UniProtKB/Swiss-Prot annotation:
Species for this entry: Thermus thermophilus
NCBIfam families associated with the record: treS_nterm
Protein's gene: treS
EC number: 5.4.99.16
Residues annotated to bind substrate: D60, H101, Q165, R195, H305, D306
Domain of life: Bacteria
Protein's UniProt name: Trehalose synthase
Length: 963
């Protein structure tokens, strides 16, 4: 693990209580958070900061802790607190370490109140409230003094915050030891970091401000030392130090203090610069924040669970901020403004996007407050700061899909009135809208993650642009450069960038990957109101692969009809959610939908294709196993191997060309080489991890030199078969489960495979097994070969000639009869294994379920679990027999067409007679048989309108009409 992971992080701050209620008691809980991890993963955050969830009387939203080792029951139990699933998704977890104070209900304080208690010095006591006179009161709206008299102790106790939060006495070694033990307890449970709440106030000394004392700095260093001695590097401390930069710098030490600290003074000055339309406040604070150790990092934020603090601004600046952002006094609290981000910006989308761009590109680790990604609002009429801590707005239902508890049972009411009401602002409404705030944030976070090192670890150089309404800076890391420009004005601005030092480099816009003219000196740009732009500065030779403007691109004539897909990077930017380029993915999925409409094996012509998962199966050239959802009149999931190649290659499956990164996409379901690669990787013992699931596989058998494709999804080589579950309908899962239990010598039992695993869910993506010696064929192909040999014997004879067909079709009829016997024995075995309650278990597939090898018929696959009448299975196989007749006749002389129906009926009769003889107890219904044949014929015609399918459909529709 990279011990500097926190520099590349995107932190999502949430209150478990506010996020999602799984047990419907009105309070969010850990199970609710677990269920919403996929949403956070899709959003693109990779670190969770959980606000206090410990035992507490909740007088200060959980920051008043009464037991550090217990979880507040409304959130769940200690058993519910597990970081495993978050870690499995690549997410870190940071929790609160409230080490300055406890609740008055904490057993430590209750014991300390008693006369002569050995725990008396765990808190700060005085006989007079005059001690530490002159130390400021932080919550002036609620407290008049830092001392409160306790009648039990007959003394005053010290509290820097609320009266019910007595400060711990860090001069007591026992207190420090106890807090270390609390930290160890949660770190042992897998927590990756701790936010040190209210850290500047640990010690008190007469004649000082009792803030940022040297003793506090040393205590922080001891805390880090204890953490690293026990766990090594990798777990972090994030300090809440609401101070000026020069007061915060000592907390970093020489790299032996905290790993991160909030840049509190920068945050209000971002809002100040926006309203003043002048970059000065931002530049000033960025310069003040320089000089931290190489391993340290600033944490950046726009809003959080507290007020927008104006403690660290001048009196004039505070007056300006109140007038600009909170003219109504009800939005003011303590020395700050209690508003969420979007209302603070007056609902202005451009200003929101601009500030988000600054948050994600300035030097530091960004923190996103829950709900701000969709533009949630606030409720100033709730007490204290609760107005910005309301339930997450998941949908527009009565209580925002946060909980099914009665409305009155909710811990806080959701925002239900005005433009930020959950009726209008919710995840459900924004998730599928590519123009929503949520989609904007997902795209930007994907870009941030794609360039995590430069934004998280790179240097920042401010550019001296003459136009002060424009903020411009360069981020550089290990030879990579990104230029960020932002217009703080509500009007369009033109400006010149002093880029003389970068002459010859080409600015490439990061979102579109569109190259701009090379730098030749001062660089003229124009940005719209509150606009921003990000450019990678690259050498000319590094951008030769990038596209010319779309209107100038001329594809080769043979590629003119190929769909174009914009791919600004490797295929991961289209297939990996955290790196995704939305426009390119949409173009890729549209191209896939187009090619899948042409697949005869697919029983659905998709109007829309969605990517559910993707695993990189091979690095060079990049090959991904994808799980797709197809939509039309119904939904269907398929698994397809997709390969991207920078050069055009021989072989099937080409379906799109890429620009940005020029190359070609191939769908490999018909490529024999892919199936050999699959066997080879499984032979090694394959294990991989996508964003969604684990992929594990094995193949105990040999890997043949050559593999032949028998049909889409099924391939075989010498002694080996491999089957890919192209259609994920559960058929392979049933095959793996049931075939080993069938006591039939002609059943090919699976011996290996590839499996998709996510928690308790598991599905089979591929199966492998052994074959007897010989050259196998798909049974449909084998039947067609026999027909091509048999049908020419009918030349010169008239249809209806007695005794003609049994002699001419002897070999074909023998194969069909064998198939009838096999199906009968299979039905009997399936009934014994799966039971017959609710209908007979069916094969559920056509001839593709079987292989032919040296005249023998082998079962290799079952369809999805289905129950019904045996006539349905008989019809599926009989339809394939009849289609083989038509395809063979299409390849022969026209004069033989007169025999089409007679040959089909003869083979059907042989098939049914063989089935009846092998399973006499199963009574077949002629009417049911005819109806099922008509239904199967209609289904196949819907898949693909070819002449053979059309003729068969017309014949059976006529028969069904007569029946």
């Amino acid at each position: 693990m990279d011990p500097l992971w926190y520099k590349d992080a995107v932190i999502y701050q949430l209150h478990v209580r506010s996020f999602f209620d799984a047990n419907n008691d009105g309070y969010g809980d850990f199970e609710g958070l677990r269920r919403k991890l996929p949403y956070l993963e899709e959003l693109g955050v990779n670190t969770l900061w959980l606000m206090p969830f410990f035992q507490s009387p909740l007088r200060d939203d959980g920051y008043d802790i009464s037991d550090y080792y217990q979880i507040l029951p409304v959130h769940g139990t200690l058993e519910d607190f597990t970081v495993d699933e978050a870690h499995g998704r690549g997410m870190k977890v940071i929790i609160e370490l409230v080490l300055n104070h406890t609740s008055i209900d904490h057993p430590w304080f209750q014991e300390a109140r008693k006369p002569n208690s050995p725990m008396r010095d765990w808190y700060v006591w005085s006989d007079t409230p005059e001690k530490y006179k002159g130390v400021r009161v932080i919550f002036k709206d609620f407290e008049t003094s830092n001392w409160t008299f306790d009648p039990v102790a007959k003394a005053y106790y010290w509290h820097r915050f609320y009266w019910h939060q007595p400060d711990l006495n860090w001069d007591s070694p026992e207190v420090e030891k106890a807090i270390h033990q609390v930290m160890f307890f949660w770190a042992d449970l897998g927590v990756d970091g701790f936010r040190l709440d209210a850290i500047p106030y640990l010690y008190e000394r007469e004649g000082t401000s009792c803030e940022n004392l040297p003793e506090t700095i040393e205590a922080v260093k001891r805390l880090r030392k204890a953490l690293e001695e026990r766990y090594g590097p990798g777990k972090i401390l994030l300090a809440e130090v609401n101070m000026w930069p020069e007061e915060t710098l000592p907390y970093f030490g020489d790299g032996d203090g905290v790993h991160m600290a909030y840049n509190f003074p920068l945050m209000p000055r971002i809002f100040m610069a926006l309203r003043r339309e002048d970059r000065g406040p931002i530049e000033t604070m960025l310069k003040e924040a320089e000089g931290i150790p190489e391993t340290a990092q600033w944490a950046l934020f726009l809003r959080n669970h507290d007020e927008l603090t104006l403690e660290k601004v001048t009196e004039e600046e505070r007056e300006f901020m109140y007038e600009a952002y909170a003219p109504d006094p009800k939005f003011r609290i303590n020395l700050g403004i209690r508003r969420r981000l979007m209302p603070l910006l007056g609902g202005d989308r451009r200003r929101y996007e601009l500030l988000t761009a600054l948050l994600l590109t300035l030097k530091g680790t960004p923190i996103v407050y829950y709900g701000d990604e969709i533009g949630m609002g606030d409720n100033p009429f709730l007490g204290d700061r609760n107005g910005v801590r309301t339930p997450m707005q998941w949908s527009q239902d009565r209580i925002v899909a946060f909980s099914r508890a009665p409305y009155h049972a909710l811990f806080l009411p959701p925002v239900s009135e005005g433009p930020y009401s959950y009726h209008f602002v919710n995840v459900e409404a924004q998730r599928e809208n590519p123009h929503s705030l949520l989609s904007f944030n997902r795209r930007f976070l994907a870009l941030r993650n794609q360039h995590a090192k430069i934004f998280g670890r790179g240097s920042l150089t401010l550019l001296p642009v003459e136009n002060r309404r424009v903020l411009a800076y360069l981020r550089e890391h290990e030879g990579e450069r990104v230029l960020v420009v932002a217009n703080l004005s509500r009007y369009t601005q033109a400006f010149d960038l002093p880029l003389e030092a970068y002459q010859g480099l080409v600015p490439v816009e990061l979102f579109s990957q569109q190259p701009f003219p090379p730098v030749e000196g001062r660089y003229r740009l124009t940005l719209g109101p509150h606009g921003f732009a990000l450019f990678a500065l690259k050498p000319v030779e590094a951008v030769l692969h990038l596209p010319s403007p779309d209107w100038a691109e001329e594809p080769a004539p043979e590629e003119a009809d190929l769909p174009r897909v914009h791919m600004p990077g490797g295929p991961e930017v289209l297939l990996v959610d955290t790196l995704v380029h939305e426009r390119g993915r949409e173009e890729l999925l549209n191209a896939l939908a187009q090619t899948l409409k042409e697949k005869s094996w697919l029983a659905l012509k998709p109007q829309k294709v969605a990517l559910l998962d993707a695993l990189r199966f091979q690095k060079d050239p990049p090959l991904y196993l994808t799980l797709l959802q197809l939509e039309n009149h119904r939904t269907l999931q398929v698994s397809l191997p997709l390969l991207w190649s920078p050069q055009r290659r021989e072989g099937p499956g080409l379906f799109a060309r890429t620009h940005g990164q020029p190359g070609y996409f191939y769908e490999l379901s018909l490529d024999p080489g892919f199936y050999r690669l699959l066997l080879a990787r499984l032979k090694e013992g394959f294990e991989g991890r996508s964003l969604r699931a684990y992929y594990r596989g094995r193949h105990p058998g040999p890997v043949p030199e050559a593999v032949d494709l028998l049909r889409p999804g099924l391939a075989a080589g010498e002694g080996v078969w491999v089957q890919l579950g192209l259609v994920q309908d559960g058929g392979l899962d049933r095959t793996e489960r049931v075939l080993p239990r069938l006591d039939l010598p002609w059943v090919l039992r699976p011996e290996g495979g590839l499996f998709w695993e996510r928690g308790a869910s598991r599905r089979v993506l591929a199966l492998t097994g052994s074959l007897p010696p010989g050259r196998p064929q798909d049974l449909f192909a084998a039947l067609e070969v026999r027909l091509l040999e048999s049908l020419p014997r009918l030349r010169g004879h008239a249809p209806g000639t007695p005794g003609l067909l049994p002699g001419a079709l002897h070999e074909t009829e023998a194969l069909v009869r064998l198939l009838g016997v096999r199906l009968a024995l299979l039905h009997r075995a399936l009934g014994e294994v799966e039971g017959v309650v609710g209908g007979h278990p069916l094969l559920g597939r056509g001839l593709g379920a079987f292989l032919e090898l040296e005249g023998e018929v082998y079962l290799v696959a079952l369809g999805a679990e289905k129950r019904g009448t045996v006539e349905e299975d008989l019809a599926r196989l009989a339809y394939d027999v009849e289609r083989a007749v038509h395809l063979a006749l299409e390849a022969l002389e026209a004069e033989l067409w007169a025999f089409a129906e007679e040959v089909a009926d003869h083979l059907h009769a042989a098939f049914l007679q063989a089935y009846r003889s092998a399973l006499p107890e199963e009574a077949l219904e002629e009417a049911g048989w005819t109806r099922h044949m008509a239904e199967v014929a209609a289904e196949h015609l819907h898949r693909e309108e070819r002449p053979a399918r059309k003729r068969i459909h017309e014949r059976w529709q006529a028969k069904a009409g007569k029946a």
